[in-house]
A protein has these predicted regions:
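Short, conserved turn/kink motifs that form compact alpha/beta structural patches or helix kinks used as
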Residues: 48-63, 73, 79-84, 100
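Short coil-to-beta transition motif at edge beta-strands of beta-rich domains
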Residues: 1-11, 55-68
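Short beta-strand-centered aromatic/proline hotspots
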Residues: 15-25, 71-84
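Short, solvent-exposed loop/turn segments that connect beta-strands within catalytic domains
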Residues: 26-30, 70-73, 85-91, 100-103
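Short acidic/polar mixed-charge low-complexity motifs
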Residues: 13-16, 37, 71-73, 102-104
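Long, charged, low-complexity intrinsically disordered regions
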Residues: 62, 66-67, 82-83, 106-114
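Intrinsically disordered, low-complexity, charged/polar segments
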Residues: 33-57, 91-122
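Acidic (E/D-rich), amphipathic helical modules within compact regulatory domains
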Residues: 5, 14-49
């Protein structure tokens, strides 16, 4: 699966471009936002040139806990975006799907997420 920060080519275009965002739909289709284009591409339209060097602690479709105030909700990562700030530094942000309320929260910082823990009963 393609990830944010991967360097790709679009179709037969020789130019190399960076993936800035990746989204997964409810029917498991993956769309990528590529630098220099004003549209999203399905993953099959892109060919990988170089993999990302960006740390990706969470993946598309992964269930995680999202901390909001005093409570934590179980959510699904449905989008990952690269956000650029001052001095051209990048930050990874997550879009989260809340299955209980059928809503999406955009641009969540990694610090507000933690993986679901699995327990084994003896």
């Amino acid at each position: 699966m393609l990830r944010v920060g991967d360097i790709v080519r679009v179709g037969n275009d020789p130019d190399e471009r960076k993936i800035l965002s990746v989204y997964k739909t409810s029917d498991d289709r993956v769309f990528c936002g590529v630098g220099g284009f004003l549209r999203y591409f399905e993953s099959y339209e892109l060919s990988l040139v170089r993999p990302s060097t960006i740390n990706h602690p969470y993946e598309l479709g992964q269930r995680v806990y999202y901390k909001r105030g005093q409570s934590e909700d179980e959510v699904v990562v449905c989008g990952i975006e690269l956000q650029y700030g001052y001095n051209d530094t990048h930050k990874v942000r997550y879009n989260l799907y809340h299955p209980c309320t059928d809503t999406v929260t955009h641009m969540v910082r990694q610090e507000k997420l933690r993986p679901l823990e699995s327990y084994t009963l003896f």
